[in-house]
């Protein structure tokens, strides 16, 4: 998955198919060439957008979970490839952005929770924290959510973060990529870059 990866620091975007990662990528980079669509799983390989002179890039990783017309074994392989990509490049990953659909994330997590099953979102969130990677959960499509505070509190609870969500604004970023409203995510990334003494990268998230 990383054969054509530019050799530079990066912020990775990951999440289920059809949560708006590619739309968010367009908002973050100002580049319109990323593939988006209604059909889940449009992105099947990493999309890199790099600034060669700055040695920095955003990477949109393939969507995981359900994809129309894709066998279960292939879906699992995609998730495995994502994990391997992150493990292989962890030293260059400045931050990970786990994108979820604000309207359906809690319901999907609950549906796939059980004695023998860990929801992919929870599994990957825990994986990122175990790697000690700065992680932001971008709760996308928040404009479609009623009772936003309750939904965000419930999401925090599922992620193992004690509500209320407002105390986790460095980790929980409610956004609407389609409407261009991504300031909470930009502010969270600004804080991460500042902590890493990478003020040279602040211009990419303002």
From Swiss-Prot:
Keywords (A to Z) from UniProt: Cell cycle, Cell division, GTP-binding, Magnesium, Metal-binding, Nucleotide-binding, Septation
MF (Gene Ontology): GTP binding; metal ion binding
Binding site for Mg(2+): 22, 43
Residue sites binding GTP per the record: 15-22, 41-45, 60-63, 140-143, 175-177
Segments forming domain EngB-type G: 7-195
Keyword Nucleotide-binding in record: yes
InterPro entries for this protein: G_ENGB_dom, GTP-bd, GTP-bd_ribosome_bio_YsxC, P-loop_NTPase
CDD domains: YihA_EngB
Listed cofactors: Mg(2+)
Gene3D superfamilies: P-loop containing nucleotide triphosphate hydrolases (3.40.50.300)
GO biological process: cell division
Function comment: Necessary for normal cell division and for the maintenance of normal septation.
Entry's family note: Belongs to the TRAFAC class TrmE-Era-EngA-EngB-Septin-like GTPase superfamily. EngB GTPase family.
UniProt-recorded name of the protein: Probable GTP-binding protein EngB
UniProt organism field: Haloquadratum walsbyi (strain DSM 16790 / HBSQ001)
Gene name tied to this protein: engB
């Amino acid at each position: 998955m990383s054969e054509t990866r530019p050799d530079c620091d990066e912020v990775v975007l990951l999440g289920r198919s059809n949560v708006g990662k590619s739309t968010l990528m367009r908002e973050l980079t100002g580049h319109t060439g990323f593939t988006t669509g209604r059909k889940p799983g449009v992105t099947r390989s990493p999309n890199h957008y790099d600034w060669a002179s700055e040695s920095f890039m955003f990477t949109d990783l393939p969507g995981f979970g359900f994809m129309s017309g894709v066998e279960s074994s292939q879906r699992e392989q995609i998730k495995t490839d994502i994990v391997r990509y992150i493990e292989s490049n962890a030293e260059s990953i400045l931050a990970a952005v786990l994108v979820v659909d604000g309207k359906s994330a809690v319901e999907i997590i609950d549906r796939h929770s059980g004695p023998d099953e860990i929801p992919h979102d929870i599994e990957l969130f825990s994986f990122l924290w175990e790697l000690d990677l700065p992680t932001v959960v971008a709760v996308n499509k928040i404009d479609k959510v009623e009772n936003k505070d309750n939904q965000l509190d419930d999401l925090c609870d599922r992620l193992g973060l004690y509500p209320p969500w407002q105390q986790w604004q460095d980790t929980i970023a409610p956004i609407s990529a389609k409407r261009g409203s991504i300031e909470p995510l930009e502010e969270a990334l600004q804080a991460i870059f500042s902590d890493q003494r990478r003020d040279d990268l602040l211009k990419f998230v303002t």
